[in-house]
């Protein structure tokens, strides 16, 4: 894959921060244009600044051995699997940039344009890099399946082990060269009597190299029971239209061994080991022979170090604390469900109520007492201290019906969930609403906006806001704690969570003779997100740039500018325009909170299968012409960009809308 030498982020910024009249694409004399700020126009950024070449190599190898063992006992089977995968990524980036010129305001005496070079040509530079990893997987499984008249028994005993190791870009940290490994034994026993009563038991005994000895293995049992009422004789005799009516309950435990650093993406390896480094920079106090560095660790030198310039010997210190008690994060799950099929399977329904109690969630101990000896700059220890309770409903249904020569199918699915942070390592606060405990995961929090300041009298009669200078037309916030000051102490839960709590879909399919039509809708709800970025904060960096028409039309405007008091609307959609930014207006608050709900026509497919006699004459088995459209329509209260992008500023790559026309021919 090839792309510009400038990143997509830089190109988008070029588009957002310039107007179409800022500069031409190129000057007629071949000069590359820029403005007074030295910016590059989007065309130059995309086509004239080198290129970045990337390629990926992936090899997957799988070997499976399947051996029946009926000579030992009927129904016994052995399966062995081995997998070996390698993934490699490489890039070569060659970057250059032409000299940039701006046209002066005044022409030369002969009438020609006078150009000033703003930046010299940047000659080609080259950088390269690569990443790679190797994965191995081994599995040995014994399966048993046997029917004893009305009794059906099955079982599985499985041994697994896997390994993943980096093969490139491992740096100088020895931990990067060590493989991540798991080893486990799992089993399952399933019994049902006459497809009426069901009983299952599962277990997993899994080990992870990421924990200290004695904490590496976890035992994760599970069981389920079910009763298919439709198989009871009185139902089969009197309610023949009931094909299946199964009620079920399951309970189980699952474990997680993955811990991440504060960025949320980098895995933490071996949290049970201390990390040791040298003491910090010299910080001599008096004429002591040994002294403690401001950054931790003892530094040693001869007496009179400053006077005689003797060598400094740095001592060692802990740079991160260990916790040899860290072990598996465990979720205990309960599920009550119903599976139903009626009218010769024309109507089917599956619905589940789930309840999950997740304990021992990994998190940094950020609020340890000073007596613990944790110093500034040290990596804090992780511990199993978090707890989250989740519950919700999940279901899907379908209905099939023949109407004349038309075959109709309607379907739908929905997941509605809710969670609560029950325990978290956070500091107690006099204002409980500032804590995350008691609220939902990813709960949107911010200030409550009361509108915009109308005038200076309104400002004088309102609590002081501590986020920088403000004036009429700026956002006015609520003093939640009543202390007369608007600060971070006034941030509360507002709106929903930033991740949808409701996800659903619905569709309909129809077939008539050779014509088939399929529609699928996708939706999400119960979510909120904050908007920011240059789209709603024009001129935030004090530079020239584009401005959205909605921002211009919907902003607060002083009567001195408009000539009418009506434009000083305290309920305006946007605050006054400001050059160089306004920290007061850029706080996360209900003013910038938006509803993330949407419904999308995800897929529309129309196809036509040619009649069989015609296809036979063409010496084919089947011919179908089709048209598929994806992401064709979206309905949402939010209109600025696609709410499914999960972006606060719209500067992410959007979902593509596509129409595909195709032909399938089977010979």
Residue spans of the language-model regions?
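Extracellular/periplasmic, surface-exposed regions of secreted and cell-surface proteins
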Residues: 1-95, 105-443, 584, 588-667
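Glycine-rich, aromatic-lined ligand/substrate-binding cores of catalytic
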Residues: 74, 497-532
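Catalytic-site beta-strand/loop segments enriched in glycine and acidic/polar residues
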Residues: 155-163, 198-207, 476-499
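Extracytoplasmic gating/loop element in the C-terminal half of outer-membrane beta-barrel translocons
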Residues: 44, 524-624
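Conserved small-residue
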Residues: 261-293, 400-498, 538-540, 548-549, ...
């Amino acid at each position: 894959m090839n792309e510009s030498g400038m990143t997509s982020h830089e190109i988008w910024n070029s588009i957002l921060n310039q107007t179409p009249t800022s500069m031409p694409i190129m000057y007629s004399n071949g000069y590359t244009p820029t403005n007074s700020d030295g910016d590059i126009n989007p065309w130059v950024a995309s086509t004239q600044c080198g290129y970045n070449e990337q390629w990926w190599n992936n090899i997957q190898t799988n070997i499976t051995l399947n051996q029946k063992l009926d000579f030992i006992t009927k129904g016994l089977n052995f399966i062995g699997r081995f997998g070996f995968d390698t993934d490699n990524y490489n890039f070569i980036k060659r970057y250059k940039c032409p000299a940039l010129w701006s046209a002066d305001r005044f022409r030369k005496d002969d009438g020609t344009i006078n150009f000033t070079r703003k930046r010299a040509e940047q000659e080609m530079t080259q950088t390269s890099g690569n990443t790679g990893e190797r994965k191995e997987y081994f599995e040995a499984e014994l399966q048993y399946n046997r029917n004893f008249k009305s009794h059906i028994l099955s079982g599985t005993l499985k041994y697994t082990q896997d390994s993943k190791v980096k093969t490139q870009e491992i740096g100088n940290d020895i931990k990067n060269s060590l493989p991540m490994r798991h080893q486990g034994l799992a089993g399952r026993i399933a019994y049902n009597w006459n497809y009426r009563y069901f009983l299952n038991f599962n277990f997993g005994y899994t080990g992870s190299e990421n924990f200290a000895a004695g904490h590496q293995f976890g035992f994760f049992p599970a069981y389920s029971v079910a009763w298919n009422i439709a198989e009871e004789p009185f139902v089969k005799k009197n309610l023949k239209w009931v094909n299946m009516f199964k009620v079920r309950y399951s309970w189980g435990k699952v474990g997680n061994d993955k811990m991440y650093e504060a960025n949320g993406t980098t895995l933490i390896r071996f949290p049970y080991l201390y990390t040791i480094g040298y003491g910090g920079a010299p910080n001599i106090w008096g004429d002591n022979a040994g002294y403690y560095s401001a950054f931790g660790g003892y530094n040693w030198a001869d007496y009179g170090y400053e006077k005689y310039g003797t060598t400094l010997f740095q001592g060692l210190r802990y740079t991160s604390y260990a916790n040899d008690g860290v072990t598996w994060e465990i979720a205990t799950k309960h599920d009550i469900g119903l599976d139903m099929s009626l009218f010769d399977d024309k109507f089917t329904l599956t619905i589940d109520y789930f309840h999950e109690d997740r304990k021992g969630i990994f998190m940094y101990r950020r609020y340890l007492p000073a007596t613990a000896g944790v110093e500034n700059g040290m990596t804090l220890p992780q511990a199993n201290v978090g707890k989250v309770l989740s519950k919700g409903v999940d279901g899907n249904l379908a209905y099939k019906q023949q109407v004349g020569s038309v075959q109709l199918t309607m379907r739908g699915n929905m997941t509605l969930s809710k969670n609560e942070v029950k325990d978290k390592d956070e500091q107690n606060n006099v204002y409980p609403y500032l804590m995350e405990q008691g609220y939902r995961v990813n709960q949107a929090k911010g200030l409550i906006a009361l509108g915009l300041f109308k005038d200076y009298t309104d400002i004088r009669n309102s609590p002081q806001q501590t986020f920088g200078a403000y004036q009429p037309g700026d956002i006015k916030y609520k003093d939640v704690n009543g202390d007369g000051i608007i600060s971070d102490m006034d941030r509360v839960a507002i709106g929903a969570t930033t991740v949808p709590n409701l996800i659903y879909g619905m569709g309909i399919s129809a077939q008539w003779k050779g014509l088939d039509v399929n529609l699928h809708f996708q939706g999400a709800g119960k979510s909120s997100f904050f908007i920011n970025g240059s789209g709603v904060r024009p001129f935030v960096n004090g530079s020239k740039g584009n401005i959205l028409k909605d921002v211009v039309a919907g902003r607060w405007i002083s009567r001195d500018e408009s000539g009418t008091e009506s434009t000083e609307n305290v309920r305006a959609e946007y605050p006054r325009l400001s050059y160089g930014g306004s920290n007061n207006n850029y706080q996360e608050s209900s003013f910038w909170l938006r509803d993330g709900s949407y419904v999308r026509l995800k897929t529309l497919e129309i196809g036509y299968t040619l009649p069989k006699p015609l296809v036979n004459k063409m010496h084919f088995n089947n011919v179908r012409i089709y048209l598929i459209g994806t992401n064709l329509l979206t309905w949402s209260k939010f209109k600025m960009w696609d709410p499914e992008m999960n972006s606060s500023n719209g500067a992410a790559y959007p979902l593509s809308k596509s129409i595909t026309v195709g032909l399938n021919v089977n010979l």
